Curated annotation (Swiss-Prot):
Entry superkingdom: Bacteria
Lineage of the organism: Bacteria, Pseudomonadati, Pseudomonadota, Betaproteobacteria, Burkholderiales
GO CC term, one of those recorded: cytosol
Database matches in Pfam families: H2O2_YaaD
Name listed for the protein in its UniProt record: UPF0246 protein Veis_4789
InterPro entries the record matches: YaaA
An individual GO BP term: response to hydroperoxide
Entry's family note: Belongs to the UPF0246 family.
Cleaved signal peptide residues: none
Organism: Verminephrobacter eiseniae (strain EF01-2)
Length: 260
């Protein structure tokens, strides 16, 4: 079973790194280098228009593209789990994971990325911004979905190759999960949905749902879950499995009010 997360727009390259964390190298550096070459040819104004960014943010990312190197080091990069700093990763709380937790996560967690395709938790990454939905034209087509094509699905197949019942647990957003070519994927997909009670009905509230995805990833990591059925025991953040609203491919978790 493999857990799938989205990356985060917010990055943290300032907080001191915890000691003793191992690291690995992303699998698609050649493809990342090709994308960086295209981005380097764009002016900050063009980047602002392409990604709908403010002028200061576009200028920052133009500088990042120029500084990016195919070789990651301790001075120019950090592990993906430490670099990403959004709501999902607030829920995951990677800094509090043990060494055995990290080793398990490295084998059972994948993070989708517009620039890197797909990452393992300990892959070193450099500061960047490139969302999967960006309409960056390449030789493969007009957007990143066409650029990555079958590559991400084939990578996930490889990681699930030895699993007798390959299952991909989707904790990613739809924008990112669209990058997984379902026709090329040799695995069953199970989606986790997190709903909060508001206005008289249960509904997905983005901020809470993102954090809950990170909580679910943490739960699976710390409990070494290997089958989708085990996910039903998730109870972090006040959520509980809702069997009447679920089916085998869509596990729904609900809560009445946010945990204090």
């Amino acid at each position: 079973m493999l857990l799938l997360l989205s990356p985060a727009k917010s990055l943290d390259y300032a907080t001191p790194l915890p000691e003793g964390w191992p690291h690995s190298t992303p699998c698609f550096i050649a493809q990342s280098s090709a994308l960086i070459a295209l981005l380097r040819s764009r002016s900050p104004q063009q980047i602002a228009a392409l990604m709908q960014l403010s002028a200061p943010l576009a200028a920052l990312n133009a500088e990042r593209y120029q500084a990016w190197q195919p070789r990651c080091s301790a001075s120019n990069s950090r592990q993906a789990l430490l670099a990403f700093d959004g709501d999902v990763y607030e829920g995951l709380q990677a800094r509090t994971l043990s060494a055995p937790d990290l080793d398990w996560a490295q084998q059972h967690l994948a993070i989708l990325s517009g620039l890197y395709g797909v990452l393992r938790p300990l892959d070193r990454i450099q500061p960047h911004r490139l969302e999967m939905g960006t309409r960056l034209a390449t030789a493969a087509g007009g957007n990143l979905y066409q650029f990555w094509g079958r590559q991400i699905a084939e990578h996930l197949n490889h990681r699930l190759h030895d699993d007798p019942d390959p299952v991909l647990v989707n904790l990613a957003s739809q924008e990112y999960f669209k990058a997984v070519d379902r026709k090329a994927l040799n695995a069953r997909v199970v989606e986790c949905v997190f709903e909060d009670f508001k206005g008289g009905a249960y509904k997905i509230i983005s901020f809470y749902a993102k954090r809950a995805r990170g909580l679910m990833a943490r739960h699976a990591i710390t409990h070494r879950l290997s089958r989708p059925r085990q996910l039903e025991g998730f109870g972090l953040g006040g959520y509980a499995y809702a069997p009447a609203a679920s089916d085998p491919e869509r596990l729904v978790f609900r809560r009445k009010s946010p945990a204090a």
